Amino acid sequence: MESRLKPGLIVLCGPTAAGKSSLAIAIAQRLGSPILSADSRLVYRDFNIGTAKPTPAEQQQVPHYLMDLCDPRQVFTVGDYQDCAVPLIQQLQEKGMLPLLVGGTGLYIKAIVNGLRFPRIAPQPKLRSQLQALGQPLCHALLQRVDPVAGDRIHVNDRVRTLRALEVFYVSGDRLTDLQQEQPPSYPILQIGLDSDRLEARIQQRTQQMLTSGFVEEVQGLCDRYGSDLPLLNTLGYRQVCAFLQGSLSRSELPEQIVLQTRQYAKQQRTWFRADSSIQWIDAEAGNRLERALDLIERFRKSEGV
């Protein structure tokens, strides 16, 4: 009687604009694997162009999960992501599949790979309104005082995660950093990183593609539907387009500012992922990147029996 293969997980991570989505689709098609998103903005509906969400045509090529999970006005925490992702991975594994977790949100990936557990504290709308009234610079400075580790990890302009960390502190009395615990999964995991020494050129190219694909129109529609004070509109790319729509950025300055801020974000992602010695890196510019990834996966499957 043939022995059943063990469950496993493949992770494809790396900085933004490195080409993870296209490589993931190619890998998934070869393996018959589903793709699970590990991107903190893809969980929201209607945020499509500026998040580089896989297009409907791309999603038809391979099953995609963990996208379009909630309304942009909802608070969606890392714990919420974990609650969705963990049972989904198990369900897919039980069907004999080898899921492919793809994205650049390091904390989402760590939540799965390391089993990082998060405090289950419900959103506090009144507290959030009070904090938002203080303004993001003051909120982040406050976070640096009450939880310096989280303050260093969370970008000064990341309003969503800043508010969440402060919310946890003021509701529980404990720092988010102290409440996080790790319970790694029992199944083997292969982490593949994708990076490029031409990342800046890739970022410039993708920014232009977003703008010609209707990014400004997408943001205008989001402002009309949800209001310009929607926290998600203060995230990378959307913040710059809002500034353009409000007249504080010119048409020529808009792509420059998006590229500049995206480069800074990519640098943070690199620092996060490069700190993990278990990640095996592939050059995004290599012509054999797909073959290289498939070779890593094949050796992983043979050694782990997955």
UniProtKB/Swiss-Prot annotation:
Catalyzes the transfer of a dimethylallyl group onto the adenine at position 37 in tRNAs that read codons beginning with uridine, leading to the formation of N6-(dimethylallyl)adenosine (i(6)A). It is an enzyme of class 2 (transferase). It comes from Synechococcus sp. (strain ATCC 27144 / PCC 6301 / SAUG 1402/1) (Anacystis nidulans). The record marks 105 as: Interaction with substrate tRNA. SUPFAM superfamilies: P-loop containing nucleoside triphosphate hydrolases. Its EC number is 2.5.1.75. The gene is miaA. This is tRNA dimethylallyltransferase. GO terms for biological process: tRNA modification.
